[in-house]
């Protein structure tokens, strides 16, 4: 149990925090106050900092008040160039120094006892790690919920490809609330009326020809992340974009890295914990639930979400987010024993459910919490499952020297995305009212891809799908390898590795891998349920996680390495483990045009013949982190 509410709240709004370059960052400060008079108390208290690009008012106000009532000073700040803060906005680049300066400013206030902790989700998690690369002297603890690690490898970009969610974000939550849009109703109206689905369907945008042309600084950073793929590009050296390069110098403070199996930052969360637990002396924790990206509760953030996409987990999945964070800070900033029983690693094991159909129409996948001393847990061993020419997947190595399967990959007919580790694939609902009658901040957002676990079959509302709708495995460009029904359960916990041996007749193409649990037909799901657990992609020119592009020679066999995001799941007896291989997953990732042209913005298209090998010489395989019984 954490601190109880015992104070009133005194708020100081739009306090300017001047950074080293003279930019004023607008900050709301919530202080514990006398409950009768609401006058701020004289006693200094530890402070919590939450930096956001989404505006510090609205739901954030109650967020600040909640902690102030429990004895914390809370500073909620608009990031540079957003809402009430001065400066030009370029995504993440200025966050390390701005965060450092704010931590030290806050620690220097008379009402702060010199200890500063940081909180925030998504962008608010990213900026925490960014400021930690600068090692502020008064930073004492961090609760990093669903944040990044290496923007080039698995956030903005992904093994050479581009995660199109950032283009969606630029057109909606980013650009819609840019300073220029907030100050010009015509620009904001134009952005509000954009149907992002049309933008995605029309193919790559071009400079000066999309709605982003009206907010040039947003167009600049959007095209930078879409077109710059090499490690040597200055963008990916920045401590605001790539924390992995700066792990050794990061602040050595107690930190919780929290995330979810269907979050867009799953791999980054686990990577941050594993790397920093090994490097730092301060306590590091990992907490992974079964949820999707973001929080699910207003006005306060919450993990009280018992489902992800078409999956239901039951009440076991519910978690009090605010109380968990409070217990952590009470321990490390107030010296209370509220965190003593917390395991170093706590995670949700999905897959203990009966597979029945819930009243909401979801599949009851179930699950339960588990703990470990390290990540991945010490009782995990990677077990290799090999693809075979007859479509089977087994631990037996291929015994033939030959064996390959070909398909045609048409970039104009990509494989549709059906859920998974998605976020920000969104568009504003169309409205007839103007922005005065119906402000942009109040408009609903439509999800384009879905997020979480989904039966891998298209339907009428699947973006990019065309009739006849049905299982993705029925497509000619999707190769499927599956085990026989399992004789006993198989539990996996940890990182996943895929190695595809393949060739193409193009100078560049993509390969994708998707791990699936196949539920057999049942009364609730007479066609079975192909549950996506994790997926990844590899752009040929960046195969092997290359730092610089290297185009392939048509007809030559290469190994394409991928790391689908970590997970924790129990494959039940009678179910099958399945590996799907293809060359696209759209719009989760941008589509390779197969021409060897520009990394983004190619105007030409080419159908590629891609061949996956599954022989003794060139074994295609997936390595699963199997937990010993």
Regions found by a protein language model. Name each.
Residues 1-43, 482, 486-488, 548:
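N-terminal cap/lid segment of alpha/beta-hydrolase-fold proteins
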Residues 33-108, 154-157, 299-312, 473-475, ...:
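Cap/lid segment of the alpha/beta-hydrolase catalytic domain
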Residues 61, 69, 133-249, 414:
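Accessory cap/linker subdomain of secreted extracellular hydrolases
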Residues 110-122:
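Alpha/beta-hydrolase fold nucleophile elbow
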Residues 119, 126-195, 261, 280-327:
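A catalytic-pocket lid/entrance helix-loop region that shapes and gates access to the active site
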Residues 191-195, 200-209, 303-629:
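C-terminal, loop-rich substrate-recognition/catalytic regions characterized by aromatic stacking residues
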Residues 257-259:
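Short beta-strand/loop motif that positions the catalytic acidic residue
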Residues 267-284:
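Active-site-adjacent alpha-helix of alpha/beta-hydrolase-fold enzymes
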